Amino acid sequence: MKVKAVAKQVPVTPRKXRLVVDLIRGKKIKEAESILMFTPRSASPILAKLLKSAVANSVHNFNFNIDDLYVEEIFVNEGIRLPRLFPRAKG
C-alpha cells in the first residue's frame, strides 16, 4: 500500500529540489532522513518535513512499521509562478 504526502506552494525551484529528490528515491526511511539531514541544499529541510509527514501518516493511519518503509516514488513538479512587477518605463 502506498502512503501519500504532498507539499504545495514550496518556495524552492524545481531544478534545485530535483537534485535532492534524486538522492533519496528508492532508499529506506532512516537512510533518506540521514541523507536529507546532511545535504546542504535549500530543499533539504522542506523534503525532510515532507518525509516525516508521510511516515507519520503511514504509522498513524495504517499501523505500518517504520523499519519496513522506503521511498518508492517521489517527484517535484513546477508550481504556480507569482506575477512580478518590473519597474521600468511603460510608454
Swiss-Prot record:
Gene Ontology cellular component list: cytosolic large ribosomal subunit
Keyword Chloroplast: no
Keywords assigned by UniProt, alphabetized: Ribonucleoprotein, Ribosomal protein, RNA-binding, rRNA-binding
One of the GO biological process terms: translation
GO MF: rRNA binding; structural constituent of ribosome
Subunit-level organization: Part of the 50S ribosomal subunit.
Family membership: Belongs to the universal ribosomal protein uL22 family.
Function: This protein binds specifically to 23S rRNA; its binding is stimulated by other ribosomal proteins, e.g. L4, L17, and L20. It is important during the early stages of 50S assembly. It makes multiple contacts with different domains of the 23S rRNA in the assembled 50S subunit and ribosome. The globular domain of the protein is located near the polypeptide exit tunnel on the outside of the subunit, while an extended beta-hairpin is found that lines the wall of the exit tunnel in the center of the 70S ribosome.
PANTHER family xrefs: CHLOROPLAST 50S RIBOSOMAL PROTEIN L22-RELATED, LARGE RIBOSOMAL SUBUNIT PROTEIN UL22M
Protein name per its UniProtKB record: Large ribosomal subunit protein uL22
Gene field: rplV
